[in-house]
């Protein structure tokens, strides 16, 4: 089926108490693996690319690959720009065929974050495309965006931010970090409930790679409607390729490397879709 926007997908999740898995993809193999996993579980799914991935492969290339693979399936597939770092990139993604975009102004102060987000929302409304924004700082490193320390999202600021920008979804900081965790993360899960009480748009959890199933499920129960996974998919992909080359160093066919990588990513995505509770929720 054609690509769909994230709006109905996330509103359905909010209404029915589950989250949509959103998976960062780096190449054709990862695109095929994520969609195959979602199709097997009859789950809605979001595929995401970051600015560095877009620089590597271009917006148009990824849009073309995802559109072609989505056309073969009956499940809802959305293509999302993750951590869009400028107004210009967000607009370029819309023009290239992305059906959802994020503008990340969380490194700005509150007023400037509102200003850049509102600017993107105004254009996105003309395209009929939903916008995700971020308030508070998620730790770790995502491409060239780095937080020196976690600053969790304030519920009242979140309420004002959503009202003034008109965003369709909001990524909130509760103690997660991008990349894998060195120690055990301490998540402020009650904060999710507090934000949900005053914000009426779907909430997004970034930095879910490496979180326990218990943590993810509780965050979803408290109101997270979209959960992002990136690092663990990269690791699954790379480890599978390394393993094949260690066992069969004579291998030189990229397709053989791609097959084992796709299987590893698919297995990881299946587990995460079930963790989010969106298996069987394709509409």
Regions found by a protein language model. Give the residues of each.
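Alpha/beta enzyme core
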Residues: 4-12, 16, 27-52, 59-74, ...
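Short active-site oxyanion
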Residues: 19-21, 77-78
